[in-house]
């Protein structure tokens, strides 16, 4: 089991916004995550999170679970009747214990994609994998650092996971927060737009969705298609 103890510090939170700090952190710490709250008026649901510097992760894709641990150990396990996605997630979670102030905030950050329904229900999903952007169906990451904004109290908390005998790096993070400079990139598209469906095929999908709604099969039906193009810049500047 991997054991961590938290190191924490609270700062005034009215001098920064989640987006402004994320723009500072994204270049220093790749794979940072931002979860921003839009409710600043009450004590509930008033927290925003920035998580950075991954230490462990679990991903599920192509019928396989990949578990990556803080010591560099990596385990790939095929999913089936005797070992499901839920078993992989439970196994991964049981490998960690976090104690200390703010430990209740130190969960996993990630996503479960729509296509992951096939790992939990007997619903067939057509496989579609793009060689340039084959994101996992399920991906959750344990991060070393969290910045927690309490918009109701105007507080900013730094939470760090420290292994046994490891000194904290709170001061280094605080210095980065106080830095007034961050990179800015102009966003622009390059070349022609690409899609996996033609315009007419997509229109027919929409017409089919309208027919299902009118017939009463569903109350809401959303139709999507993949659109891609080369870009210069960063996604946060879009």
Where do the PLM segments sit?
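Extended alpha-helical targeting/anchoring segments
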Residues: 1-238
């Amino acid at each position: 089991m991997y054991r961590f103890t938290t190191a924490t510090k609270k700062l005034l939170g009215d001098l920064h916004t989640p987006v402004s700090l994320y723009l500072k952190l994204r270049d220093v710490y790749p794979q940072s995550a931002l979860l921003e709250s839009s409710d600043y008026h009450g004590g509930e649901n008033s927290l925003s999170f920035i998580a950075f510097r991954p230490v462990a992760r679990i991903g599920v894709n192509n019928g396989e679970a990949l578990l990556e641990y803080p010591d560099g150990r990596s385990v790939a396990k095929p999913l089936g009747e005797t070992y499901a996605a839920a078993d992989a997630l439970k196994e991964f979670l049981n490998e960690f214990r976090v104690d200390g102030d703010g430990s209740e905030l130190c969960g996993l950050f990630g996503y479960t994609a729509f296509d992951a329904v096939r790992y939990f229900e007997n619903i067939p999903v057509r496989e579609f994998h793009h060689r340039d952007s084959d994101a996992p169906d399920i991906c959750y990451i344990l991060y070393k650092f969290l910045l927690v904004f309490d918009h109701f109290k105007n507080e900013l908390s730094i939470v760090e996971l420290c292994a046994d005998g490891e000194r904290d790096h709170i001061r280094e993070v605080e210095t980065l927060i106080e830095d007034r400079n961050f990179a800015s990139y102009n966003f622009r598209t390059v070349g022609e737009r690409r899609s996996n469906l033609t315009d007419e095929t997509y229109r027919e999908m929409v017409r089919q969705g309208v027919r299902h709604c009118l017939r009463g099969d569903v109350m809401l039906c959303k139709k999507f298609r993949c659109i891609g193009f080369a870009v210069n810049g960063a996604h946060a500047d879009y």
